[in-house]
Amino acid sequence: MYDGKQVLRFVNNYKTKDLYLIGNEMNKRIGTGNYDLKKTKFNVHYKDINNSNLYQEVKSILEDRNIEYSRKTKTNILNGVTFTSGPEFFMTLGLPFKETDRIYQSGDKKGQNILASDIKSKEDIPYDVTNYFNCCMKFLEDIVGKENIVMAQVHYDEDTPHIQAYFLPIVNEVKRKCYK
């Protein structure tokens, strides 16, 4: 469907202590990203939390659905996924990019200027880019279940657009090789 390289990165080790920082990054745009706050208004919120913070949201969902879980601090309580690609892919879909004054320090592009999306209005986001992210979201819903997605957003306010989503690692039965 789409040419070029896409990145699908799953993280399955978020503990309760991580949820506050994740919530701040997603909602207040405080964290490790190169945020351009002028572009934050273009971010797309597929699924937001209803409670005051991400921890309360996860706890509420688990309790409302009568899902048993270990309350130990080492328990993996949330999984995350990021869907993205390089600037070249998004440029083929019509999204404008511009060079920044920052330089790649390693990799294939070492020494080249870092490209960042050049979005000034909603009209700068082509239908094909929106459709790409809609397809990514549909794929995620199909593999983890829409009801297990706690938070999902497209971030246009960083160098390269991406979906960042978090979901509950719910399983109906445990299958282990040692029981076979």
Name these PLM-found stretches:
Residues M1-K180:
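N-terminal nicking endonuclease/strand-transfer module with a His-rich metal-binding environment
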